[in-house]
Amino acid sequence: MSATQAAPARDRLRIAIQKSGRLAEPARNLLSACGLSWRESRDKLFCYGESLPVDLLLVRDDDIPGLIADGVCDLGIVGRNELDEQAAARRQIGLPDAYQALRGLGFGQCRLMLAVPEEWQWQGPAQLAGARIATSYPAILKQWLAEQGVDAQVVELSGSVEIAPRLGTADLICDLVSSGATLRANQLTPVHNLLDSEAVLAGAVRVPDDARASLRAMLLRRLDGVVQRQDRKLLMFRASEDRVDALAQLLADAEPLVRLPADGGALRLQTMCPGPLSWQRMEELERAGAQGLMVLSVERSLA
């Protein structure tokens, strides 16, 4: 099926996720938080949606963009690094865009970086002219080198990229970095960031016009309700009318205060705060006139 063809009509949405790997468990947990549940096949490669007509296909992460492009799956949870690599490879051979990142999901963060041997003194991209760069992301690297106007040799490897300089097969590397421990163990220093990556929800450029369209819209709304509320807290308290402005100033990073029906002489107020609320901040609010402070975790919401 070409990238411009519409996928065959189906009444069930199909999502591809990693069968195993660092994104597999967080992806399933996220979809479960959206109210999805499944019955697994015996080979554990297909999960039939029970709560909603939304099925899971469990595959290798590098298969996910292609499954979306071919219309086999409607959505996929994959690292932005893999999605961008395959998109860049398609563009470099003249194929149109077939998928796009719809939402960042807030987990699986890493960076695609150039890393050089510790004895190098990094002076900038021009230093790479004629150099051999080992990578598992040749399309992204070639695109970046072209943007910099640098002619370098890209050495494509499928794994163990970090040992290439020690083996003499490359002068430096372009690889994913999380903690940097692997680079340090191989006497490499990260010097330039090509891409900030995280898990994303990817979907076809062309939205289906059958029953899947409403399922897709509903799932996106639920995902927003889960992802956007992660690490946010609902703060509830009472205060007198003359303390509201001062308290609002102390909560400038939060959503506007919402007034609830009055409880006796005090107002009941609530707001959504980003990140954790420390004891020090709660005590500061108390000194400013807040009473009965209560902090609640928010599991999900609908805007």
Curated annotation (Swiss-Prot):
<protein>
    <recommendedName>
        <fullName>ATP phosphoribosyltransferase</fullName>
        <ecNumber>2.4.2.17</ecNumber>
    </recommendedName>
</protein>
<keyword id="KW-0067">ATP-binding</keyword>
<dbReference type="GO" id="GO:0000287">
    <property type="term" value="F:magnesium ion binding"/>
</dbReference>
<keyword id="KW-0328">Glycosyltransferase</keyword>
<dbReference type="InterPro" id="IPR020621">
    <property type="entry name" value="ATP-PRT_HisG_long"/>
</dbReference>
<dbReference type="Pfam" id="PF08029">
    <property type="entry name" value="HisG_C"/>
</dbReference>
<keyword id="KW-0368">Histidine biosynthesis</keyword>
<dbReference type="InterPro" id="IPR015867">
    <property type="entry name" value="N-reg_PII/ATP_PRibTrfase_C"/>
</dbReference>
<keyword id="KW-0460">Magnesium</keyword>
<comment type="similarity">
    <text>Belongs to the ATP phosphoribosyltransferase family. Long subfamily.</text>
</comment>
<dbReference type="Pfam" id="PF01634">
    <property type="entry name" value="HisG"/>
</dbReference>
<keyword id="KW-0028">Amino-acid biosynthesis</keyword>
<keyword id="KW-0808">Transferase</keyword>
<keyword id="KW-0479">Metal-binding</keyword>
<comment type="function">
    <text>Catalyzes the condensation of ATP and 5-phosphoribose 1-diphosphate to form N'-(5'-phosphoribosyl)-ATP (PR-ATP). Has a crucial role in the pathway because the rate of histidine biosynthesis seems to be controlled primarily by regulation of HisG enzymatic activity.</text>
</comment>
<comment type="pathway">
    <text>Amino-acid biosynthesis; L-histidine biosynthesis; L-histidine from 5-phospho-alpha-D-ribose 1-diphosphate: step 1/9.</text>
</comment>
<dbReference type="GO" id="GO:0005737">
    <property type="term" value="C:cytoplasm"/>
</dbReference>
<keyword id="KW-0547">Nucleotide-binding</keyword>
<dbReference type="InterPro" id="IPR013820">
    <property type="entry name" value="ATP_PRibTrfase_cat"/>
</dbReference>
<keyword id="KW-0963">Cytoplasm</keyword>
<dbReference type="InterPro" id="IPR001348">
    <property type="entry name" value="ATP_PRibTrfase_HisG"/>
</dbReference>
<dbReference type="InterPro" id="IPR018198">
    <property type="entry name" value="ATP_PRibTrfase_CS"/>
</dbReference>
<dbReference type="GO" id="GO:0000105">
    <property type="term" value="P:L-histidine biosynthetic process"/>
</dbReference>
<dbReference type="GO" id="GO:0005524">
    <property type="term" value="F:ATP binding"/>
</dbReference>
<dbReference type="GO" id="GO:0003879">
    <property type="term" value="F:ATP phosphoribosyltransferase activity"/>
</dbReference>
<dbReference type="InterPro" id="IPR013115">
    <property type="entry name" value="HisG_C"/>
</dbReference>
